């Protein structure tokens, strides 16, 4: 019985220590296909390597939140860091600017990464 209690305590302590770890997300913004003005495409924001899992991701068009956005399920890597993909259909043109805004406990203010049509 004492062995079980010790093992249970060690498991709880290791899980508690995992919550103390914080890693900022890596943010990548890209289109599914090469940008071609006037042709439908998909805008992707891949957020990876972050911990803890609480995160807020918004896709932006000219600084305003895009409402019709889908995302993958929250998943984790071998190192227990998390990753997500947010995406939406869009039609690129010369005048509109697209970006991904991420809020995470590791950032003092939300971080915004602009889409570079040449990437």
Curated annotation (Swiss-Prot):
Keyword Zinc: no
CDD domains, alphabetized: IgC1_beta2m (cd05770)
Cellular component per GO, a single term: extracellular region
Paired cysteines (S-S): 45-100
Signal peptide boundaries: 1-20
Every Ig-like C1-type domain range: 25-114
Cited InterPro entries: B2Microglobulin (IPR015707), Ig-like_dom (IPR007110), Ig-like_dom_sf (IPR036179), Ig-like_fold (IPR013783), Ig/MHC_CS (IPR003006), Ig_C1-set (IPR003597), MHC/Immunoglobulin (IPR050160)
One GO term of the biological process aspect: antigen processing and presentation of peptide antigen via MHC class I
Keyword annotations of the record: Disulfide bond, Immunity, Immunoglobulin domain, MHC I, Secreted, Signal
UniProt-annotated location(s): Secreted
Family in the record: Belongs to the beta-2-microglobulin family.
Role summary: Component of the class I major histocompatibility complex (MHC). Involved in the presentation of peptide antigens to the immune system.
Subunit structure as annotated in this protein's UniProt entry: Heterodimer of an alpha chain and a beta chain. Beta-2-microglobulin is the beta-chain of major histocompatibility complex class I molecules.
Protein name: Beta-2-microglobulin
Record organism: Saguinus imperator
Gene: B2M
